[in-house]
Each structure stands twice: as structure tokens, then as C-alpha cells.
Amino acid sequence: MTPRSWLFVPGASRRMMDKATTSGADALILDLEDAVAPDAKAEARRTVAAFLDTGPAIPCFVRVNGLGTGLTEADVGAVRGRVAGFVLPKCEGPRDLDRLSAWSGNAPVLAIATETVRGVRALFAEDWSHPCLL
């Protein structure tokens, strides 16, 4: 089944993740980026990993921190192999997808927004086809 409804859930709140599984959404996006305070990123990673260890019955994607933060690889490493895929914020082109794919073992990537001017320009200047894009 292709998910039609996606629910963003703060990665720092186990209670909200547990509740989200009964929301009726087709998939969850566990957010480690904007929904988590900078000083809570490491703890949120552990919280998301522990939630995924319970084997939720709903597909879960993880929105990692952007490549420019220096946090992306640790985000991916904490949940690799236990998610339906990843959401990469501020993606600016296929090279960014290549980096995420290398860390994730070619897990699917959900591309839902282009958030930077460079990314928008790249949409028109580059071929964005990538084997990991959903």
C-alpha cells in the first residue's frame, strides 16, 4: 500500500510516537530535525531508536537533520535497517541523496519539499532521478 497520509511526530516524545500509531495515519515521520531542540538531539535519537525497536505496525520514516549540521550520519546510524525510509531536509540535489544512501544502505528517501534556493535551482538544472527516491 502506498501511504496517503503521513503524520509528523516529534522524535523527542515517546508518548507522542506511541499515540501516533493509533492516529489512523498510513505512515509516521519521526522528526529529529525541527521538532527537536539542539541540546536534545542525541536523546531524541535514542528515543526514536527505542520506539522502532518495539516494531510499530505502521511504516515509520525518520526525518534526519540536514547534511550541513554534522548530525545526519549519527541520525541515520541510530535507526538504519529499522525504518521504511528517510526524509532529508534541505536536499539540494542528487549528490546529497548519494551521501544519505551511502550511510543508509540505499534506504528509500521521501522527497517532500525543496527548502533552499539552491535546491529549487537544481530542480531545473540537474537530473534528480535517483534509485532511492520514492
Feature locations, PLM:
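Conserved alpha/beta-domain cores
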Residues: 2-134
